[in-house]
């Protein structure tokens, strides 16, 4: 049914002497106005495809070049499915209530039948076999007064009672959408029932979300933001605080390109849905509590991440935007990305990197508790299986030599006599028969030890 026919038929209902069924006050043009309520056939109504409850879904579909015409049967059925899937549990409860007592809350439509408030209710009434929708009818079309209708729609959709039932991402999209249309921040705040600073935060976080989708190569596919709101809030605060190289929370001398690395690494962790304390360990809170607060720890964490994540990304296939169910396809792609990050024991390098560097943070906090740290080191060394083939790997041997250098340095600094005792024990522990193949090299080392010992003896006697 076209627009002109809907206007005509709705107008005929409004013109009947007995057409109205009571009235309600609604905010219209900066005043509460008492408006009559009518029973309008559901066949004359058109869903609002940009309804705040499903905005992320319709925008995602349109990004895939899906044309959603709410006036067609196909478009209507698609929007009804999106409305139902937005909250099946709550929809079932409301549907049961409709079957028992009918429609409780009155809707709002334009004179040409576009639903401004009540899309979900209209869908449930249709599914319940009802024929009519109780509603106020505005005396304008959407095109005749778009700003006032947007204001009314936002006030109803994002009111305190309604916003709790919406997908969390929808409020960010709504704030962005209104801002892009030129609505002042103060007005958006009033319409959405929020403070000005909250709206500014919503728009900033939405900017991070858009950048994340661009990073993944799926711009505008807002369904990929589901379940990730808290991480985006945290990351946006971090980036805003750190940019400009003036913050005291990162390590001394950090640069904006370090902040860029932080953002990219955080995007990878957001993709695999790391959250809570694990995610905040990367760069949230006081300097001493996160990786980005210590240059050495951060660089180690960063290098490990990029070294391990890049081969996985290089092996990913290009996104097939023509796939029938893009959301399921992208979710599966993200799951496979995470699965490829796991080793033969099933542990992801994402987890390994967080855990190992979190341990370094704890070590740093215990810098004035040497006994505690040394006991931890002993326990870690005792846990090594020296019979495992990996133990003799060159990289492992280099690390052992590094440990030896550190312990010698510690003993030399505070207990030279203990160091000499340690050297004697080490010399006594050497099994000469094990060095047949390196006989000449060992003899040279022994000569060098003799020279060093002779010089030490002279120096000590001279004290």
PLM regions: where:
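C-terminal amphipathic alpha-helical interaction region
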Residues: 383-463
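Amphipathic, charge-rich alpha-helical segments that serve as recognition/docking helices
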Residues: 79-84, 130-214
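Active-site-proximal acidic segments at structured loop/helix or strand boundaries
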Residues: 210-233
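Amphipathic alpha-helical repeat elements characteristic of tetratricopeptide repeat
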Residues: 88, 165-169, 371, 417, ...
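Long, charge-rich C-terminal accessory regions
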Residues: 225-409
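Short, charged/polar connector segments at secondary-structure boundaries
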Residues: 1-134
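Tandem CBS (Cystathionine beta-synthase) repeat/Bateman regulatory domains
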Residues: 27, 53-57, 166, 174-179, ...
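Regular secondary-structure segments
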Residues: 176-180, 378, 382, 428
């Amino acid at each position: 049914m076209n627009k002109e026919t809907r206007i005509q038929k709705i107008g005929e209902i409004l013109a009947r002497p007995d057409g109205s069924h009571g009235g309600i006050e609604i905010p219209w043009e900066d005043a509460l106005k008492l408006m009559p309520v009518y029973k309008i056939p559901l066949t004359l109504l058109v869903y609002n495809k940009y309804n705040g409850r499903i905005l992320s879904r319709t925008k995602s579909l349109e990004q895939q070049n899906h044309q959603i015409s709410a006036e067609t049967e196909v478009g209507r059925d698609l929007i009804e499915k999106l409305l139902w899937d937005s909250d099946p549990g709550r929809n079932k409860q409301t549907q049961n209530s409709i079957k028992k007592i009918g429609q409780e809350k009155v809707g709002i439509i334009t004179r040409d039948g576009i639903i401004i408030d009540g899309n979900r209710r209209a869908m449930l009434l249709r599914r319940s076999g009802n024929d009519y929708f109780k509603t106020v009818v505005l005396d304008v079309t959407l095109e005749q007064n778009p700003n006032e209708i947007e204001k009314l729609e936002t006030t109803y959709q994002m009111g305190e009672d309604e916003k709790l039932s919406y997908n969390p991402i929808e409020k960010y999209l709504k704030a962005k959408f209104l801002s892009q249309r030129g609505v002042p921040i103060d007005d958006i705040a009033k319409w959405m029932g929020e403070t000005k600073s909250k709206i500014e935060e919503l728009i900033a976080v939405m900017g991070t979300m858009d950048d994340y989708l661009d990073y993944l190569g799926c711009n505008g596919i807002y369904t990929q933001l589901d379940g990730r709101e808290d991480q985006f809030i945290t990351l946006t605060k971090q980036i805003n605080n750190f940019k400009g190289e003036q913050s005291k929370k990162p390590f001394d001398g950090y640069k904006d390109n370090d902040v860029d690395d932080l953002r990219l690494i955080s995007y990878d962790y957001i993709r695999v849905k790391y959250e809570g304390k694990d995610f905040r360990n990367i760069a949230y809170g006081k300097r001493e509590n996160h990786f980005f607060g210590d240059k050495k720890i951060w660089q180690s964490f960063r290098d490990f991440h990029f070294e391990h994540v890049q081969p996985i990304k290089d092996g990913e296939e290009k996104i097939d935007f023509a796939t029938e169910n893009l959301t399921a396809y992208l979710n599966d792609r993200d799951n496979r990305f995470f699965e490829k990050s796991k080793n033969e024991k099933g542990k992801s390098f994402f987890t390994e990197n967080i855990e190992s560097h979190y341990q370094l943070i704890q070590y740093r906090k215990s810098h004035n508790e040497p006994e505690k740290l040394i006991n931890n080191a002993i326990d870690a060394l005792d846990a090594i299986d020296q019979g495992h083939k990996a133990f003799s790997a060159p990289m492992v041997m280099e690390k052992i030599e590094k440990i030896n250098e550190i312990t010698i340095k510690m003993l030399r600094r505070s207990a030279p006599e203990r160091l000499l005792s340690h050297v004697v024990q080490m010399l006594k522990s050497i099994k000469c028969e094990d060095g047949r193949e390196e006989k000449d090299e060992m003899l040279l080392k022994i000569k060098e030890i003799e020279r060093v010992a002779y010089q030490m003896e002279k120096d000590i006697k001279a004290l």
